[in-house]
Amino acid sequence: MHSPGAGCPALQPDTPGSQPQPMDLRVGQRPTVEPPPEPALLTLQHPQRLHRHLFLAGLHQQQRSAEPMRLSMDPPMPELQGGQQEQELRQLLNKDKSKRSAVASSVVKQKLAEVILKKQQAALERTVHPSSPSIPYRTLEPLDTEGAARSVLSSFLPPVPSLPTEPPEHFPLRKTVSEPNLKLRYKPKKSLERRKNPLLRKESAPPSLRRRPAETLGDSSPSSSSTPASGCSSPNDSEHGPNPALGSEADGDRRTHSTLGPRGPVLGNPHAPLFLHHGLEPEAGGTLPSRLQPILLLDPSVSHAPLWTVPGLGPLPFHFAQPLLTTERLSGSGLHRPLNRTRSEPLPPSATASPLLAPLQPRQDRLKPHVQLIKPAISPPQRPAKPSEKPRLRQIPSAEDLETDGGGVGPMANDGLEHRESGRGPPEGRGSISLQQHQQVPPWEQQHLAGRLSQGSPGDSVLIPLAQVGHRPLSRTQSSPAAPVSLLSPEPTCQTQVLNSSETPATGLVYDSVMLKHQCSCGDNSKHPEHAGRIQSIWSRLQERGLRSQCECLRGRKASLEELQSVHSERHVLLYGTNPLSRLKLDNGKLTGLLAQRTFVMLPCGGVGVDTDTIWNELHSSNAARWAAGSVTDLAFKVASRELKNGFAVVRPPGHHADHSTAMGFCFFNSVAIACRQLQQHGKASKILIVDWDVHHGNGTQQTFYQDPSVLYISLHRHDDGNFFPGSGAVDEVGTGSGEGFNVNVAWAGGLDPPMGDPEYLAAFRIVVMPIAREFAPDLVLVSAGFDAAEGHPAPLGGYHVSAKCFGYMTQQLMNLAGGAVVLALEGGHDLTAICDASEACVAALLGNKVDPLSEESWKQKPNLSAIRSLEAVVRVHRKYWGCMQRLASCPDSWLPRVPGADAEVEAVTALASLSVGILAEDRPSERLVEEEEPMNL
């Protein structure tokens, strides 16, 4: 059923709101009129049109907003592009370290993406083509940024403009916060082609010498061997000397590995043995690689140490493989130029210097265990020997560079030099220099030997005499061949005398910088009489006077806790012999209670002390005190075994005030008492004499041996009836038990009116010290050498006027005992000039040098009245213990001053007086002799 009007196309139904359409009355062709869409179709098309309209509107708006952005992203003008990039680079280079971040720049991001893509492509190619060469792990060459990677990344990353003056390869991959890598881009390409082998010749080295004709090799004229340019500006120890120019690096490396590789193991292991050959097989051309000439010319006699140090590889076992080229083939092939002197070395001297090596033969047995090379564990990296270098001895390390942390338990295990330092290993591991090697010193070393004999080396503080003679220092002493060299010194030094005398050992000196660290935390030495400048000044004075070069310098060691406990209590040793670091190795339970009992006082300077005088440094005081005790003990053992003639220990802090459980008077451990006790325990000496001429009484030493008859203690000190520190040391303190009579105190009284001086001390030595010491007949003499009785000390510290010459004379007198086995240990003394003068006089006396004689007035002057009364009291008290005191009591002439040379007369008078004293002694007991004795004739 059709609706009305459906078949008439001119008729349309009326819809609400529509206008009536007029009828088309045209007779011609009429346009085709599409029928109106149905309402359902209109309903479906309306949302589609709406979405399209909204999409076009949004796209149009997006194009409008993107237009300014496109304008800003356009590449800048060429003139602005370079400046902007340079400014960005400068900001990166000059960026503050505190403001740096890990955000990578656009350049880095682009490079990173290129590198990643390049590696992915390379990995893909390797999987597809397995035979393709592998990519190295790291390439220092600039990366290539051209190729397909840029075209691929251009669709993802915007183009980054580069500087107009630099190509793109100047932007290597780098870390954003690494300044050295930023600087790398401005270096030329040649800086990346550095030598990779330390054995190669530097490009900056001076040009090599040309071969001279055979007739000019023996010429020794200055014109042919030296030029003005070969002085200090052209050092002898250049990196490679006059070796010929080396070949290319890559070629040389291949030839080196191909030649040496098959003959020995590869050095991939840091401890792998290194095989060096006497000879090398020639290549096809008939010549050897120039870079292998230093190994070719190396002689086995040059290498004394069992380990050979190669830079970067550590110590390597040094072996010699079988020679690959015989001597005949090597000599006839002309593979290298003959050896000759370098331009900066002096001329070989004449044969007159050869007798200087003759005295070395008698000292072989005594000095052989002492001459040693540098320890391999502490040797710095060294380069291989050059053909122009001669055999050298290596210097023993100085005391300041080798500070150890512990010492041996007992000196018996440390008698030899190689066993006294802990952790050194057997002597075979260190290597020793035989006398035959010393006798084979070439002429160029003989010249240096003569120079070393004529003057001491100020820098060699711990060298033994033989090492001083044979060692060739690294620096040149004569840079010109024409420089005159004196082969014989005008005056033979004591070192020359020691070399010429095989029966007299040397004098020992002990010093170490460890003892300098014991100082107050305030840092002001003027407020502390006992400071590090004392031993430092003495050591410098001995060097200035040339006495150190005449002695055998020792470093000493740190005393063990067991050695300290031979004199002091365990509590005392743990309190003052440990520091926070060493306590970590001990029993915490025992230390906790002891440390809680320790008390310190606050000093006026702001530091900490055991008392108002004795400062304490928690980190360094214990090490310094233990080092002083160990050094004196070590020196005493060497003298007791007659390895040394005598010795002087420049040590601090002092020790003669430290008793069994108390630290006082700047003292913590009694060094002399510990050395004496160790000598007794190890059977090194049966009878020991201790002389203490410090102005203060050695209360600690007296207490230690107060009951010991095998130790005679004689002290000369200011007493003033107990009113001078420490208050002990009265004349009637003679010992107890079996040790009664073996403690002698020369207690000076009378204050400083007048002060004691040379006449009083000379009288004490002549009347008391030497007679009792001769009667005791000691095996060894230990001296607590305090110099605070010397002139220059204020009244609270001494106030006496004993001269340095008098100290030297007293040392000479003591050397007449025990076969000259005398050991001096520094105790007190606080005026730097006075203690330096006194130490110099004592060391000169120990060496046997001529000491300045005392003035005639000192010999003729009579002791003051206070001194005579003090000496009378000593004779009275010890008359019943010593026969010499009985003889002196009845001999008035003995109180008169004696001039040197009158010893025979004194002995005659003493012998005559002893006869009458002996008769009286038979009739009356000694007690009645003391009571009924008439006053001496003064």
Curated annotation (Swiss-Prot):
UniProt biased composition (Basic and acidic residues): 190-204
Organism whose genome encodes this protein: Mus musculus
Molecular function per GO: 14-3-3 protein binding; chromatin binding; DNA-binding transcription factor binding; histone deacetylase activity; histone deacetylase activity, hydrolytic mechanism; metal ion binding; protein kinase C binding; protein lysine deacetylase activity
EC code(s) of this entry: 3.5.1.98, 3.5.1.-
Region (Disordered): 1-40, 155-280, 331-361, 373-463, 472-491
Keyword Disulfide bond: no
Protein name according to UniProt: Histone deacetylase 7
Entry keyword set: Chromatin regulator, Cytoplasm, Hydrolase, Metal-binding, Nucleus, Phosphoprotein, Repeat, Repressor, Transcription, Transcription regulation, Zinc
